[in-house]
Amino acid sequence: MSTPANPEDPWARLRQFTRARIAIGRTGHAQKTASILAFGLAHAQARDAVHLALDVAALDVALRDAGLDALHVLHAHGAAADRDQYLRRPDLGRSLDAESRARLVPSPQPYDVVFVIADGLSALAAQRHAVPLLQAVLARLHDWRVGPVVVARQSRVALGDEIGERLCARQVVMLIG
């Protein structure tokens, strides 16, 4: 067993495996200033991320550049009219708006899987990570009947149920921020 870089800090070795705030320490009865400031910054970034809109046009370009446009990309929207309503009324993010219901028509043959890229509470996370993850997963689904990729705004996880039902999908994979 190796000795930690700082023998006074037994947690140093474990911190390399996580960005979580573990064993942040104290000075007297208070937390260290650096950890308080780091938490404040992370909290502000999270609050900003919640209000960011999903850049659907950029996501469409990323899907095309990754060679995934052959899957056919559909756009959907939760029932919330805007981001403020989405945040105040989680129930509206769990169902499609009328226009999206009309756009998502059933397939004559069921799909094995449909992928949904959804903004959730962090559109930035979906924007950054969904396409590479989708590429990696699709590379292993050779014999699967893969349905269209659905890009959904103002979406909660449960929106995948309605999307899967409307598109006749056996499974839905939600890539949600």
Identify the role of each PLM range.
Residues 1-2, 102-107:
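Intrinsically disordered, low-complexity linkers and terminal tails enriched in Pro/Gly
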Residues 93-97, 133-137, 168-170:
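Short, low-complexity, polar/charged sequence segments that are solvent-exposed and flexible
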Residues 105-140, 149-151, 156-165:
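Internal active-site segments that recognize and position negatively charged phosphoryl groups
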Residues 74-77, 146-176:
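A structural signal for small-residue-enriched, beta-sheet-centric alpha/beta enzyme cores
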Residues 2-91, 95-98:
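Active-site loop/lid in soluble adenylation, ligation, and acyl-transfer enzymes
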Residues 118, 176-177:
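Single, functionally critical "micro-switch" positions that shape active/binding sites
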